[in-house]
């Protein structure tokens, strides 16, 4: 029997604050944050992410965010591209529809964590998934929550998952 093909799985991590969180969080929140994290999963030569427009894909580093600030090796998977795209399609029709997006409770990091576990059985780093509760645990975070709840984030540069890399 042939050994299964293994495909690398990477977590792309972007600091949406471009360093401002590191400098301003002690003053505004009373605690140090290293960044405001956006994440995506790179597998099968594409980058997949979730925002207010639903699940999208692009070539790795192909959003207007540019190259990631860091790359985490999540592991490898035996899941083929065909099965993975079917899985994403089902997620896009259920858990990860665009209207389900919520900056604090159901965001790009929730998606990356779900997909990483499906592909590799591993979670993404807790410093990323714990960020919303860290912010909301501060008086400033609670005061800003109504405003922040109305924010919808969709990194430009991707296409809907039904059309990887913008192909129809």
From Swiss-Prot:
The UniProt entry annotates the motif Nuclear export signal 1 at 83-91
Enzyme Commission identifier(s)? 3.4.-.-, 3.1.2.22
Catalytic activity, reaction form: S-hexadecanoyl-L-cysteinyl-[protein] + H2O = L-cysteinyl-[protein] + hexadecanoate + H(+)
Q: Where in the cell is it found?
A: Cytoplasm; Nucleus
Q: What regulates the activity here?
A: Palmostatin B inhibits its palmitoyl protein thioesterase activity.
Write down the Pfam families for this protein, in alphabetical order.
Peptidase_C97
Query: What are the boundaries of the signal sequence?
Result: none
Q: Per the UniProt entry, what is one GO biological process?
A: proteolysis
Q: What InterPro entries does the entry give? A: PPPDE_dom, PPPDE_sf
In which broad location class does this protein mainly occur, judging by the first location in its UniProt entry?
Answer: cytoplasm
Give the main EC class. hydrolase
Sequence motif Nuclear export signal 2, residues: 139-153
Which GO cellular component terms, listed alphabetically, does the Swiss-Prot or TrEMBL entry include? cytosol; nucleus; protein-containing complex
Q: What GO MF terms are annotated?
A: deSUMOylase activity; identical protein binding; importin-alpha family protein binding; long-chain fatty acyl-CoA hydrolase activity; palmitoyl-(protein) hydrolase activity
Q: What does this protein do?
A: Protease which deconjugates SUMO1, SUMO2 and SUMO3 from some substrate proteins. Has isopeptidase but not SUMO-processing activity. Desumoylates ZBTB46. Collaborates with UBQLN4 in the export of ubiquitinated proteins from the nucleus to the cytoplasm. Exhibits palmitoyl protein thioesterase (S-depalmitoylation) activity towards synthetic substrates 4-methylumbelliferyl-6-S-palmitoyl-beta-D-glucopyranoside and S-depalmitoylation probe 5 (DPP-5).
Oligomeric form and interacting partners:
Homodimer. Interacts with UBQLN4; leading to the export of UBQLN4 from the nucleus.
**Family classification:** Belongs to the DeSI family.
Name the record gives this protein: Desumoylating isopeptidase 1
Q: What would be the name of the gene that encodes this protein?
A: DESI1
């Amino acid at each position: 029997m042939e050994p299964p093909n293994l495909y690398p799985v990477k977590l792309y991590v972007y600091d949406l604050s471009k360093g401002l969180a590191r400098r301003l969080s002690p003053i505004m929140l009373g605690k140090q944050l290293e960044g405001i994290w956006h994440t995506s999963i790179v597998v099968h030569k594409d980058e997949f992410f979730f925002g207010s427009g639903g699940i999208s894909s692009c070539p790795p580093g192909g959003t207007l965010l540019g190259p990631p600030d860091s790359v985490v090796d999540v592991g490898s998977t035996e899941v083929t591209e065909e099965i993975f795209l079917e899985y994403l399609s089902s997620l896009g029709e259920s858990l990860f529809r665009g209207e389900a997006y919520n900056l604090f409770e159901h965001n790009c990091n929730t998606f990356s964590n779900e997909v990483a576990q499906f592909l590799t059985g591993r979670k993404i780093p807790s410093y990323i998934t714990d960020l919303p509760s860290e912010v909301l645990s501060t008086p400033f975070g609670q005061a800003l929550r109504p405003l922040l709840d109305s924010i919808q984030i969709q990194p430009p540069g991707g296409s809907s998952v039904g059309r990887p890399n913008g192909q129809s």
